[in-house]
Swiss-Prot record:
GO cellular component, one term: plasma membrane
Signal sequence extent: none
Cofactor: FMN
Residues with FMN phosphoryl threonine modification: 187
Family matches, as HAMAP family: RsxD_RnfD
Lineage: Bacteria, Pseudomonadati, Pseudomonadota, Gammaproteobacteria, Enterobacterales
Gene: rnfD
Annotated localization: Cell inner membrane
Protein name: Ion-translocating oxidoreductase complex subunit D
Family: Belongs to the NqrB/RnfD family.
Quaternary structure annotation from Swiss-Prot or TrEMBL: The complex is composed of six subunits: RnfA, RnfB, RnfC, RnfD, RnfE and RnfG.
Function (record text): Part of a membrane-bound complex that couples electron transfer with translocation of ions across the membrane.
Transmembrane segments: 20-40, 44-64, 89-109, 123-143, 215-235, 244-264, 267-287, 301-321, 322-342
Entry keyword Cell membrane: yes
């Protein structure tokens, strides 16, 4: 009888990179379906466009670097970056913005640092921030949720306006953004901040049609609940750990609740922070990126809490309506320092 001699390790682990990436993409589906239901097919088209661009950009870059293209693309990391980017962008953002952000995320933020596992910053958020700084008007132009739309936008309408700038009937993005009251639509966070700075009270702001069914804005609470469900799925599968999402959400809720209790006439209610914008997407899918996040348990708690604090500060005092992307990138800068001071004590050594 012949015996096969194999070298260690002899343990088996199903958590391969390819499988992890696919699980994260699968976990995004509940939030994506909520986006489609309340805001139309735009984000679905953006995800498809970003995915095609990401695979082409990664393939070309790998070929230039003399890497095995097919093997490397099979890890699905480029696909996940594209999905997260497509989810984050406004549904009807022009096609060239999607391509530009994806190329920047894959080539500049990932491959120029050495590829998967070498990048210090989250590639999807780098691409998003490049667009937000360069094209702030387009990046804050969101469709009203379906119940408030005066001009219904179907799949064909969304596809045409993304590539041409207007629907087949000749409607522009600015016309589509007006809700049933004739008011130009923005995200709930943007609307609340702008209205508050114009002198309105929180009570009067929350009487607007956007907030009629929920403090977090029509549709937005279900989008966030969808990503929460996906995040819990990842936790149960052991794909991510609880430290970053929990500390992120607790830190954000603590800051929002404390400020709201002290001065409710000046600050947004906690539920608006919790279930609006990219809160759950950021907590479970973006901040938990194992490459750019802290690697120790104590470090993860600090990292998540720092992001929650930064999100609240940017949303409250910053010039942009949602601060998740900036908060994650700023926290990425601190990861080496956090890991240095939270590294566990080696056995047999005092420190």
């Amino acid at each position: 009888m012949a015996f096969r001699i194999a070298s260690s390790p002899f343990t088996h682990n199903q958590q391969r990179t390819q499988r992890i990436m696919l699980l994260v993409i699968l976990a995004c589906l509940p939030g994506m379906l909520a986006q489609v239901y309340f805001f139309g097919y735009g984000n679905l088209i953006q995800v498809g466009l970003a995915s095609a661009t990401a695979l082409i950009a990664e393939g070309v870059t790998l070929s230039l670097r003399k890497f095995a293209v097919r093997t490397t693309l099979a890890d699905n990391s480029a696909l996940l970056t594209a999905v997260l980017l497509g989810i984050s962008l406004p549904p009807l953002a022009p096609w060239w913005m999607v391509v530009m952000a994806t190329v920047f995320a894959i080539i500049i933020a990932k491959q120029l640092y050495g590829g998967l596992g070498q990048n210090p910053f989250n590639p999807a958020m780098i691409g998003y921030v490049v667009l937000l700084i360069s094209f702030p008007v387009q990046m804050t132009s969101w469709l009203p949720p379906v119940p408030l739309q005066t001009i219904p936008v179907g799949f064909h309408d969304a596809l045409v306006i993304i590539f041409t700038g207007h629907t087949p009937d000749g409607y522009t993005m600015q016309q589509l953004m007006h809700n049933v009251d004739g008011i130009s639509q923005a995200t709930p966070l943007d609307t609340f901040k702008t209205s508050l700075r114009s002198g309105q009270t929180p009570q009067s702001i929350l009487q607007q049609p956007m907030f009629a069914q929920s403090l977090s804005g029509i549709g937005w609470q279900w989008v966030n609940i969808g990503f929460l469900i996906g995040g819990l799925f990842l936790l149960m599968r052991g794909t991510i750990r609880w430290h970053i999402p929990v500390s992120f959400l607790l830190s954000l809720m603590f800051c929002a609740s404390l400020s709201w209790v002290i001065a409710p006439e000046k600050f947004a209610p906690p539920m608006l922070h919790l279930l609006s914008g990219a809160t759950m997407l950021g907590a479970f899918f973006i901040a938990t990126d194992p490459v750019t996040a802290s690697t120790t348990n104590r470090g993860r708690l600090i990292f998540g809490a720092l992001i929650g604090l930064l999100v609240w500060l940017i949303r409250t005092y910053g010039g942009y309506p949602d601060g998740v992307a900036f908060a994650v990138l700023l926290a990425n800068i601190t990861v080496p320092l956090i890991d240095y001071y939270t590294k566990p004590r080696a056995y047999g050594h005092r420190r």
